[in-house]
A protein has these predicted regions:
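Acetyl-CoA-dependent GNAT
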Residues: 1-25, 30-31, 43, 79-84, ...
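Alpha-helix C-cap/termination motif
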Residues: 17, 49-53, 78
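Short loop/turn motifs at secondary-structure junctions
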Residues: 23, 53-55, 76
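Acidic-residue sensor for enzyme active/binding pockets
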Residues: 25-26, 47, 60
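Conserved acetyl-CoA-binding loop-helix of GNAT-fold acetyltransferases
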Residues: 29, 35-48, 66, 70-74
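Conserved GNAT acetyl-CoA-binding A-motif
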Residues: 50-62
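Conserved beta-strand-loop-alpha-helix junction that forms the acyl-donor binding cleft
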Residues: 59-69, 85-92
């Protein structure tokens, strides 16, 4: 858990996929505590821990999560251009935000309907 002023305001979850492949599996900071450098501090601490035994540290972010991507870029992370592909079993629960062309295929960028 991430504590700020003695209060739990978020969490960090690190994971390892073997072979020195280490990931920030999850980072969450309560909305009312965002913008205070808490996430940046948490990532810095995670990097310090992981750098003691690994050569690199990976973070995944949804393409639509611009705020997170800007933070990770500011902290020195580069895009690997990986693609996560999903099959929706309940298409009616999603709405299409945009379409992206990858190679010669069109993919819909979706989110859960509110």
């Amino acid at each position: 858990f991430i504590r700020y002023g003695g209060e739990a305001v978020g969490l960090v979850h690190l994971g390892s996929r073997g072979g020195e492949i280490d990931w920030l599996e999850e980072l969450f900071v309560l909305p009312e505590f965002q913008g205070r450098g808490i996430g940046t501090c948490a990532i810095g601490l995670a990097e310090k821990i992981v750098s003691a035994y690994s050569e690199s540290f990976y973070i995944e972010a949804a393409a639509r999560n611009e705020k997170a991507i800007r933070l990770y870029r500011k902290l020195g992370y580069d895009c690997l251009n990986t693609v996560t592909i999903r099959k929706d079993f309940h298409a009616e629960r999603f709405e299409t935000l945009s379409t992206e062309r990858i190679l010669d295929m069109d993919f819909q960028i979706k989110r859960y309907k509110e």
